[in-house]
UniProtKB/Swiss-Prot annotation:
Binding site for Zn(2+) 2: 107
Glycan attachment points: 162
Record-listed Phosphoserine modification sites: 45, 122
Residue ranges of the region described as Required for complex formation with BFSP1 and BFSP2: 1-63
Species name: Didelphis virginiana (North American opossum)
Encoding gene per record: CRYAA
Protein name listed in UniProt: Alpha-crystallin A chain
GO MF annotation terms: metal ion binding; structural constituent of eye lens; unfolded protein binding
Modified residues (N6-acetyllysine): 99
Sites bearing N-acetylmethionine, chain numbering: 1
Domain sHSP: from-to ranges: 52-164
Amino acid sequence: MDITIQHPWFKRALGSLYPSRLFDQFFGEGLFEYDLLPFLSSTISPYYRQSLFRTVLESGISEVRSDRDRFVIYLDVKHFSPEDLTVKVLDDYVEIHGKHSERQDDHGYISREFHRRYRLPSNVDQSAISCSLSADGMLTFSGPKIHSNMESSHSDRSIPVSREEKPTLAPSS
C-alpha cells in the first residue's frame, strides 16, 4: 500500500490565499502581485487566472512515501548543490539541512538555508539508507523496510549525498 503525505486538499486548492505561500521554499525568486494581493489581481484582470495548483507544482515539494517495501522522501532543493546539503540520521529521525553562502542573482544578493526533520518508521533498515540529488534538484532519500518482526537498530550517522546526472521524474500520487 502506497501512502502519500501531502497538504490537506483545501490548502492545495486555495494555496494562493494563505500568507504562508510567501514563506515556502520558492523564496528569493521575486514576488508577483497575486502573491501579495490575490483578490486584487483577479479584480484588475478578470481574464487572468492563476493556477490553483501553482503552489504545489512550482514551490519546494516535500513528499513522503511509505509503502510495503521502502520509505522515500522527495525534496525539491534546486538551489543547493550536494556540498550545501547535510543529511543525518539521528535515532528515529532524518534531518536534512541545506545552506549556501550569499550569491549574486538578478535582483541582488541572496543566501538560503532550510532545516527539515522527518520521523523514520521503526522498520526502516537504517544501515541501507541512501540519498541522491538529481540534475533537476530533486533530493531523494530512501531506505528499505525490514520485513521481519525485528526493529531496525538506531544509530546516529551522516548520509552522503550522491549526484545523479539525470533528472528525477516528478513524484506523483
